[in-house]
Regions:
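Mid-domain Rossmann-like dinucleotide-binding core that forms the NAD(H)/NADP(H) cofactor-binding site
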Residues: 1-37
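Short amphipathic alpha-helix with an adjacent loop that forms part of the alpha/beta core around
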Residues: 40-53
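C-terminal capping/lid region of NAD(P)-dependent oxidoreductase domains
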Residues: 130-131, 135-144, 152-172
């Protein structure tokens, strides 16, 4: 959210918990939408409405599954869907007619692999992100800290989907 905002994007956050999504507004999101239908309206319809019918230019998708399916239907012509993961448990599958007809790209994003294959550009990217963080533009939100001997509880906390932002395990 913070990076998109810094780059001048109108950030539309999506998720399954309105309580958690409200926090994204503090981080700079312009809007937030629930990914499940609300009053019979899907989030793809809401994205289209918020973008004057055009759709999103870039979609950052760490979820996959149904969210990816809907994302393909609300991406703008020439847009990019960034596949960052599949926390839904269902790996995204794209019928190739969708990007052909709508003229969008699907890009797999693996920061570590990118840095390994192109170390110079990888370092440039890390340096740029670090600079933004050093300047105060990117501030990670840590919702809860656990001691090292509480690591099991930290994992349970994540599995129970209680976190908003990041969980930190600290060594004292």
């Amino acid at each position: 959210v913070q990076l998109g905002k810094k780059m001048g994007a109108k950030v539309i956050a999506t998720g399954t918990s309105e309580e958690k999504l409200k926090k994204t507004m503090d981080w700079g999101a312009s809007h937030y939408l629930l990914t499940h239908k609300k009053d019979g309206v899907s989030f793809r319809e809401e994205v289209k409405e918020l973008t004057d019918g055009k759709g999103a230019d870039v979609i950052y998708d760490p979820v996959g599954g149904d969210v990816f399916d809907e994302s393909m239907r609300c991406i703008n012509w020439g847009g990019r869907i960034l596949i960052v993961g599949f926390t839904s448990g269902r790996i995204p599958i794209a019928p190739v007619n969708m990007p052909l007809i709508k003229g969008f790209s699907i890009i797999g994003v693996r920061a570590g692999e990118y840095g390994r294959r192109d170390p110079v550009r990888g370092k440039e990217n890390v340096d740029a992100i670090k600079k933004l963080a050093d300047e105060g533009h990117l501030k990670p939100y840590i919702c809860r800290k656990f001691k090292l001997d509480e690591a099991k509880e930290a994992i349970q906390f994540m599995y129970q989907r209680k976190l908003v932002g990041k969980v930190a395990v600290v060594m004292d």
